[in-house]
Regions:
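Short, solvent-exposed beta-strand edge segments and adjacent coil->beta transition regions
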Residues: 78-80, 167-171, 225-229
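A common structural junction motif
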Residues: 101-102, 189-199, 247-249
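Conserved small-domain helix->loop->beta segment predominantly found in fold-type I
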Residues: 132-190, 196, 213-222
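Glycine-rich beta-alpha junction loops
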Residues: 48, 70, 119, 134, ...
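Short, well-ordered beta-strand elements within core beta-sheets of diverse protein domains
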Residues: 113-122, 169-177, 229-233
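PLP-dependent enzyme catalytic core of the Aspartate aminotransferase-like
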Residues: 187, 203-249
Length: 249
């Protein structure tokens, strides 16, 4: 689809991998090659992966952006974001815009993110390990129609994810048997908190169709009504699985 969409007037290609909330995987190197051939620059939102698991600049991206609110901060106590590049010309242009527009984080917000970066590696390993355990549980549960996770060999982007990522992350989505069951499920958990954010040490659960992606309803970008999204934290995997088990009934 990307190749067909590129034209002479394409100036910028904005990508996300894994995508939110369906966890599709984009071949970053192939996408960057195609975009550059069309004369466009490539921006990758790397929030779901974090720099620990994926570094888009190494795969041809020109700019990488992150919500520092998520995995980089890691404790759900900061609001921020950043853009990074390894191109001196782009860096100069971004620096000018930042200075002229005042897009500068407060010193305490910056400190919180720097603090979070110190534990990023150990947290991401825990997120990934817990996610793998939760995926195994969901795969075997009859109340779950389908699990969406790039770490599964059955995932269509699994091989690409293996090439460009150092782990499959802490985000999981799955399809319940119906919208009614999905909505009921997210209200029944006790350890998983019903909330829209992600990437913190605590586990979160949400219904994208009624929460984060409600604005896409009745559009080509609408999420499946029976979709549930999980942000797997670093609590005991046994506790997380037991909570999902009772919520799924």
């Amino acid at each position: 689809m990307l190749f067909r969409s590129l034209g002479d007037d394409t100036a910028l290609v904005w990508l996300e991998s894994p995508t939110n909330p369906l966890l599709n995987i984009i071949d970053l190197r192939a996408a960057a090659h195609a975009a550059h051939a069309a004369g466009a620059i490539v921006v990758v939102d790397n929030t779901f992966a974090s720099p620990y698991l994926q570094r888009p600049l190494e795969h041809g991206a020109d700019i990488v952006v992150h919500s520092t609110t998520k995995y980089l901060g890691g404790h759900s106590d900061v609001v921020g974001g950043f853009a990074a590049t390894n191109d001196d010309g782009i860096a100069e242009r971004l620096g000018f815009l930042q200075n002229s527009l005042g897009a500068v984080p407060g010193p305490f917000d910056a400190w919180l993110v720097l603090r979070g970066c110190k534990t990023l590696g150990v947290r991401m390993r825990a997120h990934c390990e817990n996610a793998a355990r939760v995926v195994d549980f969901l795969q075997a549960d009859e109340a779950v129609d389908r699990v969406l996770y790039p770490g599964l060999p059955s995932h269509p982007g699994h091989e690409i994810a293996r090439r460009q990522m150092d782990g499959f992350g802490g985000m999981i989505s799955f399809l319940a048997r119906s919208e009614r069951e999905a909505v009921a499920l997210v209200a029944r958990t006790k350890i998983w908190t019903l909330a829209e954010s992600l990437g913190g040490v605590e586990s979160l659960i949400e219904h994208p169709g009624k929460m984060t992606h409600a604005s896409t309803a009745d559009s080509p970008f609408a999420t499946p009504p029976n979709l549930v999204r999980l942000s797997v934290g670093i609590e005991s995997a046994d506790d997380l699985i037991a909570d999902l088990d009772q919520a799924l009934g």
